[in-house]
């Protein structure tokens, strides 16, 4: 099925965002693991895998619309400490929420409800990511940065 070029552009834009998130989260997870923040590392790694599933869904839709995926991620923003990582990831997710809101609008305007439904699903996931990241910044503020870090060293699964 031939897709609308404007919708395909949004699908590829979303794919680039997801590829960036996969890589950024994966690097941050490995850094946290290296520093001994195992609980945080496990959660961030799961986020990376979730973003990979998002990318897969986007590629499937792009191929369904007889288009070619753009596999070039955007520039990564790697934090030098946990606080910077959380802030970098929060900015990435806030940008993704804005991008998905625009993509929903464009898909709707171009009568591509299949793509619109996909964008809505991914938007909800990104909003959940924003919520979790905002909770982390709140915990850092309430507990203090050092105490927050002590809550992230658990090796329990």
Question: What residue spans do the PLM features occupy?
Answer:
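Iron-associated oxidoreductase/ferritin-like identity signal
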Residues: 1-157
């Amino acid at each position: 099925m031939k897709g609308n070029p404007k919708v395909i552009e949004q699908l590829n834009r979303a794919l680039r965002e997801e590829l960036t998130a996969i890589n950024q989260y994966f690097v941050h997870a490995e850094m946290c693991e290296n520093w001994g923040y195992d609980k945080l590392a496990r959660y961030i790694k799961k986020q990376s895998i979730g973003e990979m599933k998002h990318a897969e869904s986007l590629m499937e839709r792009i191929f369904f619309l007889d288009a070619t995926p753009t596999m070039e991620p955007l520039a990564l923003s790697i934090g030098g400490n946990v606080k910077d990582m959380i802030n970098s990831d929060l900015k990435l997710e806030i940008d993704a929420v804005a991008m998905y809101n625009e993509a929903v609008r464009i898909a709707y305007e171009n009568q591509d409800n299949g793509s619109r439904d996909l964008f809505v699903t991914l938007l909800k996931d990104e909003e959940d990511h924003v919520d979790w990241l905002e909770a982390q910044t709140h915990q850092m503020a309430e507990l203090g940065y050092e105490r927050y870090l002590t809550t992230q060293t658990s090796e329990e699964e």
